[in-house]
Amino acid sequence: MVIKAKSPAGFAEKYIIESIWNGRFPPGSILPAERELSELIGVTRTTLREVLQRLARDGWLTIQHGKPTKVNQFMETSGLHILDTLMTLDVDNATNIVEDLLAARTNISPIFMRYAFKVNKENSERTIKTVIDSCEQLVAAESWDAFLSSSPYADKIQQNVKEDNEKDEAKRQEILIAKTFNFYDYMLFQRLAFHSGNQIYGLIFNGLKKLYDRVGSFYFSNPASRELALKFYRQLLLTCESGQREQLPALIRQYGIESAMIWNEMKKQLPTNFTEDDC
């Protein structure tokens, strides 16, 4: 098992998760004692304890005072955040996970957007306009740096859009533009979900954020994807302004079909880092 990690805690977490996935510590089994496991992994017991607590919160393990730590049937106990981890573990199934994400978004968006446009019309319009204006400025800018210097949301963008230490300047620009466009795409769906008045829809997007960023940062590297998304945002705005909420299912379904066509071409040449863990 070859594990790359940036810290002892990251290494321990990956070791345990990959051991669960590969059957070394299968679901239903008991983990080795803390002392034995810390020596096996090569980390301190303090570090291991922190990792075990985190994995328990994420649904991988059950920790009970005075009893051995048990490995869970993680597909029954984990939340949406596990999907990004599964992308790194089950590489052969990665594209299916992406397609499940896109299908789920297409299926639930008409529901929460209908409510958002009804009960929170003004805020919904403001959100969509902000995303349209920012994305139009992004694609029209001479460079990502030029866009950032003129954006009123520069601080927030820098908090959410991380550099990859890419040395080739042209590639760096492409990567940052794609990540920033995805930042706005996520903003649109997540905020409209919360504008619906039902927090559950917004929290679903919160749980999907890491996977959403992984997929969107690649998907929006294609100019056709950005062009299609902007067209969709403008149609959404018109629908919200007109109050014709009954048009949402057909509009969103059509966007899902057209974006899936782009994805089906892009997935034939996935970058090598598409399923790499960033921890």
UniProtKB/Swiss-Prot annotation:
Domain of life: Bacteria
InterPro entries, alphabetized: FA-response_TF_FadR, FadR_C, TF_FadR/GntR_C, Tscrpt_reg_HTH_GntR, WH-like_DNA-bd_sf, WH_DNA-bd_sf
SMART domains: HTH_GNTR (SM00345)
Gene3D superfamilies noted in UniProt: GntR ligand-binding domain-like (1.20.120.530), Winged helix-like DNA-binding domain superfamily/Winged helix DNA-binding domain (1.10.10.10)
GO molecular function: DNA binding; DNA-binding transcription factor activity; fatty-acyl-CoA binding
Protein's name according to its UniProt entry: Fatty acid metabolism regulator protein
Lineage of the species this protein comes from: Bacteria, Pseudomonadati, Pseudomonadota, Gammaproteobacteria, Vibrionales
Domain HTH gntR-type: 6-74
